[in-house]
Amino acid sequence: MKKQYLSAISLAVGLISSQAYAADCSAVNTYPDWPQKNWQGQPSHANTGDKLVHNNTLYQAKWWTSSEPGTGSAWQYVGRCDTGVHITPVEKYGRLQVCGTGLCSEAKQRIQLRGMSSHGLQWHGLGKCLTDKSLDVLSYDWQADVLRLSLYVQEGGYETDPVGFTNQMHTLIEMASARGLYVLVDWHQLDPGDPNYNVEAAKTFFTEIVTKHKHRNNLLYDIANEPNGVPWSAVRHYAEQVIPVIRNIQPNALIMVGTHGWSTFGASMSDGDLQDVIDDPVPFENIMYTFHFYAAAHTDYHRNMLDRASDIFPVFVSEFGTQHYTGGGANDFVSSQKYIDLMARKKISWTNWNYSDDPLSGAAFKVGSCASQNFADSELKEAGAWIKAKILEGR
């Protein structure tokens, strides 16, 4: 058996990141051992500024309260308690690379990443569903490997405020990196479906992101979310323009390219097919192709396409749901489990849509969870509870 190794650099980054947001919980009472007593001399409450540990998490009271820490507005989240070195995904695997038809660690061992995708940053981003608390939950409680940060280009996204959304992406990359997560930077073009429509904006965005974060070993780049309404040749033409922009700054960057038919290798369009990519693949190394599915709508035909494509190309399922492709409707966990089994067997990495409290059934949390900053299991929707269990499986 070959031993997995960790370079001194990746180990140092992992150790720094795993402890960057750890709270000092020493000499702090643990709930229900209240710091303040009632007139009978029994521990009963907290005063303004008092701290209390609950579920390995440090909270501070905003005002007098006898409520359970973390369950209401009376408590301010401080951070996860530092209980020792937490081995992060980045510390474990180092800089990722493509080897053969799979994703591999720095030690060239085949791996599978499992994690979550954000919703659109313009709706559920920084300070809303993506906060210190929610990222701690994703990293430490869910034990995710990767967070996909979905930056819509249109629909109130990047094109409305390029500087503001680029800065938000910078901050979120730093926050996720501090927890040792892999970060999938998602250029979420959707409508218009031709990625060439946004090619100049993409060049500007990736130049700024890659330049600032080129020292990191945990970033992955998805340059085209869901190309649609155009043939594979148009997607390939776009990739040929954007990939060199990234590679000129970070030569060993791992880059993902969406495929025609909403990233289905043509399965979701009438005149496209996997053969289009086989005949004319992207002419760069260290490239993966993305595949998306929604299990209630995309059953055997799409599942077979994923199976076929992953025999030939390195594939990353950067978005999927257990429901309809609208992101809503009933969950189909039978179809979803078939996909999970296929991806586990072939070590296909995935990120599930989505880590938010959006009203649709595809969101992990119930509406209002982000506003209250309550990300407990009691706040999970059916899909959220199911996907959390899949991320934790075998940990």
Predicted features and spans:
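Extracellular glycoside hydrolase catalytic/binding regions
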Residues: 199-220, 224-349, 353-357, 362-393
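Aromatic-lined substrate-binding rim segments of carbohydrate-active enzymes
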Residues: 131-192, 199-204, 247-249, 335-346
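The substrate-binding groove and active-site-proximal loops of carbohydrate-active enzymes
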Residues: 122, 153-162, 189-196, 224-230, ...
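N-terminal signal peptide c-region/cleavage motif recognized by signal peptidases
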Residues: 17-19
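Tryptophan-rich substrate-binding surfaces of secreted polymer-degrading and adhesive proteins
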Residues: 23-86
